[in-house]
Amino acid sequence: MVLKNWSRGTGKKKYRVELWSHGKNSKKIRTIQFGHKDYGQYKDKTPLKLYSSKNTLDKKRRTAYYNRHPKNYPRYSADWLSKKYLW
């Protein structure tokens, strides 16, 4: 699977990314929205860096986030994308 077409979300408060299959007959599988512009994150590691002004680099907040969201959701879910690209 490949993440393509990063953009601002439809509500303009989130990130939006498309999940595509691999191969010659690649097709879009789904669109995922994650994050929120009104809340801070540890560090914005997305290709767009739209909300990098909200970076806190606060390890205490990062630990608190992981304590609030302990479950590991499947790869390419909104939770997985948030943990990989924002926290």
Ranges and model annotations:
Residues 1-87:
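Arg/Lys-rich, low-complexity, intrinsically disordered basic segments
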